[in-house]
């Protein structure tokens, strides 16, 4: 199938006993009713093996309709790209059918529906966290522009004491006040230094901007908490797998385990070996060799969500003396290959352990 935003072209390739292949092509819209017609048309022609390329998000509705009745293979466009020449949507669909018929298409990993839903929510949580980081940076910029040096006297500008002082500054602009009642007793910075740090000037525009930013941050925090509750509720069906993941060094909380589970799924048989899983996650060097020379040995770009998470887990596992075997391996690799490559190697070892667990 050649899938587009508003329509798709489906081509059935049927080979008879004499080895002659006959093609049937039809065009369907991407409305749900038309996709059901596509499903019925495929079943009426006894076609239960379907292949399509992953074009953006447009393949999702098609896959959702067909996955219960057909074996659906979704492939990266580079694996089904037609040779240069005359190009039409109908010819593209026929080309994909021919490749699939001869078992020349490498399918992408599509996890079960419940894992896909969990993955979607976890990735949205990552996006909200990114938005929160951006808003914190903008809030800090407002304070810096107005010459409030809270970041010099507090370790966390968004902690309890600093937030209370910021609220006082916004509610009473231009007024002098004593900061002592707003500072927590555990704060080690002298009150006099804090008092000097809050001697800035808020313009009307910067103050209003900061109010909007703080309101947005509160909204993001609330929605993140709601999303976390939903994710934890859905993940209850995978408690045994989550408990196993928590035994891996560096994974200290259930939410991290859930995020890893949402990316790789619970069934490791879809990957032939642990090396296939590591390659899929983008933790192995690329193969780019020509005329006996390696052009690059950089790791791949895949695993945009899983790879950063595993790097964080590797950093946590290789820090301190809790796991001396991992710490020692990281130190040995770091001397020879550098810190970044050492951490990637540790992340790959941890993912290999996850595969076998």
Residue ranges of each PLM-predicted region?
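A detector of single, family-specific signature residues
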Residues: 1-357
């Amino acid at each position: 199938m050649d899938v587009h935003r508003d329509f798709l072209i489906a081509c059935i390739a049927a080979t008879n006993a004499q080895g002659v292949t006959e093609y049937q092509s039809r065009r369907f819209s991407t409305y749900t009713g038309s996709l059901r017609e596509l499903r019925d048309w495929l079943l009426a022609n006894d076609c239960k093996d379907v292949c399509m390329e992953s074009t953006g998000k447009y393949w999702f509705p098609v896959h959702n309709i067909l996955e219960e009745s057909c074996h659906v293979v979704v492939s990266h466009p580079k694996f089904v790209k037609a040779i240069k020449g005359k190009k039409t949507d109908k010819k593209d669909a026929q080309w994909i059918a021919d490749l699939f018929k001869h078992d020349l298409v490498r399918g992408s990993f599509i996890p079960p529906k419940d894992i896909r839903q969990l993955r979607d929510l976890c990735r949205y949580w990552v996006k909200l966290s990114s938005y929160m980081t951006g808003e914190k940076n903008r809030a800090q910029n407002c304070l810096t522009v107005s010459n409030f040096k809270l970041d010099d006297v507090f370790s966390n500008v968004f902690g309890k004491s600093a937030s209370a002082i910021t609220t006082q500054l916004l509610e009473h602009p231009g007024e002098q006040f004593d900061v002592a009642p707003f500072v927590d007793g555990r704060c080690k910075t002298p009150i006099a230094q804090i008092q000097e740090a809050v001697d800035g000037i808020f313009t009307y525009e910067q103050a209003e901007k900061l109010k909007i930013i703080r309101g947005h941050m509160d909204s993001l925090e609330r929605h993140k908490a709601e999303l976390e509750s939903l994710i934890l509720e859905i993940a209850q069906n995978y408690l045994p797998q989550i408990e196993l993941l928590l035994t891996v060094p560096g994974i200290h909380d259930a939410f991290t385990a859930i995020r890893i589970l949402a990316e790789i799924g619970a069934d490791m048989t879809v990957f032939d070996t642990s090396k296939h899983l590591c390659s899929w996650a983008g933790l192995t060097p690329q193969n780019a060799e020509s005329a006996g020379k390696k052009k690059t040995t950089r790791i791949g770009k895949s695993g945009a969500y899983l790879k950063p998470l595993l790097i964080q887990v590797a950093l946590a596992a290789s820090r301190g003396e809790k796991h001396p075997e991992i710490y020692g391996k990281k130190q040995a690799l770091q001397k020879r290959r550098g810190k970044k490559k050492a951490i990637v190697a540790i992340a790959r070892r941890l993912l290999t352990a996850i595969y076998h667990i």
